Amino acid sequence: MKCSVLQMSRLSWTACVLLLPLLLLTLQGGVQGCFIRNCPRGGKRAVDSVQPTRQCMSCGPEGVGQCVGPSICCGLAIGCLMGTPEAEVCQKENESSAPCAVSGRHCGMDNTGNCVADGICCVEDACSFNSLCR
């Protein structure tokens, strides 16, 4: 049985239509990245049963702060340092495959953030003023 060019074209088109979504889903799972504790479902640390097992890295002058984002170092004695040389060490947190836990009282919408300095609450990769953190 011989296939005509038209039949081969339809067969190829059908295969592409069926395989393209599968390929896109596979690629999406492989390239999705995240930092410290803001990983979406499917991200590199997104295993639901895995809870943070270690404290986030120390940073700031004399290591008195903790990393709460890729360029954010916060501590009670120093407030929050964002994008400064003291906060650069926080980028190394991305190299770890294990999630870390940010210390501090829960705050923010639905208590998903942590008080990291006097009056400052950080949620995932954003920080804001919060009266509960005093």
Curated annotation (Swiss-Prot):
The keyword Disulfide bond applies. Keywords: Cleavage on pair of basic residues, Disulfide bond, Secreted, Signal. It comes from the Eukaryota. GO terms for molecular function: neurohypophyseal hormone activity. InterPro entries: Neurhyp_horm, Neurhyp_horm_dom_sf, Neurohypophysial_hormone_CS. This is Terepressin/terephysin. It is found in: Secreted. Belongs to the vasopressin/oxytocin family. Residues 44-50 form a propeptide. Residues 1-33 form the signal peptide. Disulfide bonds join C34-C39, C56-C100, C59-C73, C67-C90, C74-C80, C107-C121, C115-C133, C122-C127. The cysteine framework of the terepressin is C-C. Transmembrane segments: none annotated.
